[in-house]
């Protein structure tokens, strides 16, 4: 129910600023990758079967369960990390971001995950190469 507007504008601003400090979205990640100099490494935290089914081209595969054991060997602490998992119904990217932050990495979560990446018709890489799926008609550029 939306009848208790107890957050002050300052509290709301602080809340949303905190979210934007640790989240990014599919469109912003795609634009950064397209620039050729994204300033971060994109990390797919899903398991091997999901990775093989399709992933964002250029992403690093590091399943969430293996972050504690492998992050230092596979990632550069001086480069921020953006994590993703399947999609909004999965908190794997959140868990991966938490695990990375606990061991000293600067990290953000890509909200929407791989599901929204693919639904927006962005390039997907598999063992057969890179393809761009047909965009879901329910997704459009929000222009924000």
Located regions from the model:
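Short loop/helix-cap segments at secondary-structure boundaries that form the rim of catalytic
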Residues: 51-57, 117
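Catalytic cysteine-centered active loop of the rhodanese-like fold, especially the PTP/DSP P-loop
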Residues: 72-118
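Short, flexible helix/strand-to-coil boundary loops that buttress conserved ligand/catalytic motifs
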Residues: 55, 71, 121
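Short, hinge-like loop/turn segments at secondary-structure boundaries
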Residues: 60, 78, 124-128
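Short active-site oxyanion
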Residues: 36-42, 57-58, 80, 106
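Glycine-rich, highly charged phosphate/nucleotide-binding loops
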Residues: 62-69
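Short secondary-structure capping/turn micro-motifs that flank functional sites
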Residues: 68, 116-117, 133-134
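Flexible, polar/low-complexity N-terminal or interdomain linker segments that lie immediately upstream
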Residues: 1-53, 126-144
């Amino acid at each position: 129910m939306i009848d208790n507007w107890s957050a002050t504008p300052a509290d709301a601003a602080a809340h949303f600023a905190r979210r934007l400090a640790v989240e990014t979205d599919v469109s912003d990640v795609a634009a950064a990758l397209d620039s050729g100099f994204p300033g971060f490494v994109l990390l797919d935290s899903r398991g091997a079967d999901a990775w093989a089914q399709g992933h964002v081209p250029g992403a690093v595969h590091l399943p969430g369960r293996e972050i504690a054991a492998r992050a230092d060997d596979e990632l550069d602490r001086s480069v921020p990390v953006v994590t993703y998992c399947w999609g909004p119904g999965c908190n794997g990217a959140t868990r991966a971001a938490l695990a990375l932050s606990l061991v000293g990495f600067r990290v953000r979560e890509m909200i929407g995950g791989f599901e929204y990446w693919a639904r927006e018709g962005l390039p997907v890489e598999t063992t057969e190469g890179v393809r761009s799926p047909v965009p879901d008609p329910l997704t459009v550029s929000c222009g924000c």
